[in-house]
Amino acid sequence: MTTEKGEQLRQQLIAAVVKKRAAIARAHEIVVRLLEPGIPEPEFLSLLCEIGPPNYSDIVDEREINKLCGYPLCSTVLENVPKQKYSISASKNKVYDITERKKFCSGYCFKASEYIKSQVPTSPLWLRDRETRPSFQLLPRNT
């Protein structure tokens, strides 16, 4: 009887590992897909539930490396990217770290990307089938 339980537990563990690997591989496929310019909005929103925040950060970083705006729905090519890490505002007497901001073509794209990133589920990818599918909202254009 203990060997039956042991074998059953072993099979469950193997199934869980296979499921985990498949979810991670699917997330990687989505990252690669979202590196391309011209992603349709409905497709983008449908793919978000299958990735996690680290995957989304990878998308932004890889798009920047490819000289594309980090926001997956934007196809703008990045030109004249500032080389400095900080921006100094003399009028506000502040220093701003622009490391993340310079991955985007505009303030809107930066805000929209951060808005989406805040909605991406943080639960493990392989356990998402037990959750209700979230509904993602895009940042309106006039903000």
Swiss-Prot record:
The keyword Oxidoreductase does not apply. It catalyses: O-phospho-L-seryl-[protein] + H2O = L-seryl-[protein] + phosphate; O-phospho-L-threonyl-[protein] + H2O = L-threonyl-[protein] + phosphate. Its EC number is 3.1.3.16. GO terms for cellular component: cytoplasm; nucleus. InterPro entries: Rtr1/RPAP2, Rtr1/RPAP2_dom, Rtr1/RPAP2_sf. It is an enzyme of class 3 (hydrolase). Zn(2+) binds at C69, C74, C105, C109. GO terms for molecular function: RNA polymerase core enzyme binding; RNA polymerase II CTD heptapeptide repeat phosphatase activity; zinc ion binding. It is found in: Nucleus. PANTHER family: RNA POLYMERASE II SUBUNIT B1 CTD PHOSPHATASE RPAP2-RELATED. Putative RNA polymerase II subunit B1 C-terminal domain (CTD) phosphatase involved in RNA polymerase II transcription regulation. Belongs to the RPAP2 family. This is Putative RNA polymerase II subunit B1 CTD phosphatase RPAP2 homolog. It comes from Drosophila melanogaster (Fruit fly). The lineage of its organism: Eukaryota, Metazoa, Ecdysozoa, Arthropoda, Hexapoda.
